[in-house]
Amino acid sequence: HNVRPDGVHFTISDTGWGKAVWGKLYGQWFCESCVFVYDFEKFKAADILGVMEKYEITTFCAPPTMYRFFIQEDITKYDLSGLQYCTIAGEALNPEVYNQFYKATGLKLCEGFGQTETTLVVATLVGMEPKHGSMGKPSPQYDVALVDSDGNEVANGEVGEICLHTEKGAPIGMFKEYYRNPEKTKE
């Protein structure tokens, strides 16, 4: 999330989603960033934008659906000048939202892919130029392959499924096993 010690990081994530832990606590605290927590009953884009303005949020992450609601508001009426880095997680983002958010804020949204069982696998890493429609590059801790339905690696530019090589062991943060259920783990 490109956090820093003098920043205020805000991730919107339900606690049932792994993103709640690895997206708003572990890395942010390790980097000595303030972690902003805001509890709300129902998501309202205007309320969140107001909170981001009031508390001078510097880095922000939310599912793309929330950005779709943000662009329905007049984002320019909020002072988001403190906002320096925005990320998305959870689903693909359509170009219209990416472009409208960029036009309103001057910020390019950084995409990534991960699961509760893996943490962040592929991302627009710090220092990379965000490119709409691209999840970025594999995280250095993972040995990533794109494979077809038969498990064969596909060529660059081909569609495939993201798979992780774990023959040498699972990276830190990756799901290890089902608790006391070796049969389920073997599946």
Residues covered by each model-derived region:
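Gly/Ser/Thr-rich phosphate-binding loop
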Residues: 1, 5-9, 30, 57-62, ...
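Conserved AMP-binding/adenylation subdomain of ANL enzymes
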Residues: 1-58, 73
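Hydrophobic alpha-helical segments typical of transmembrane helices
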Residues: 11, 47-48, 66, 97, ...
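Gly/Ser/Thr-rich beta-alpha loop segments that engage phosphate groups in nucleotides
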Residues: 18, 92, 116-118, 135-138, ...
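Short, solvent-exposed loop/turn segments at the edges of secondary structure
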Residues: 23, 28-30, 81, 139-141, ...
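Beta->alpha turn/N-cap motifs
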Residues: 63-64, 168
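Conserved ATP/PPi-binding loop(s) of AMP-dependent carboxylate-activating enzymes
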Residues: 138-141, 152-187
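Hydrophobic alpha-helical segments, especially N-terminal targeting/anchoring helices
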Residues: 147-148
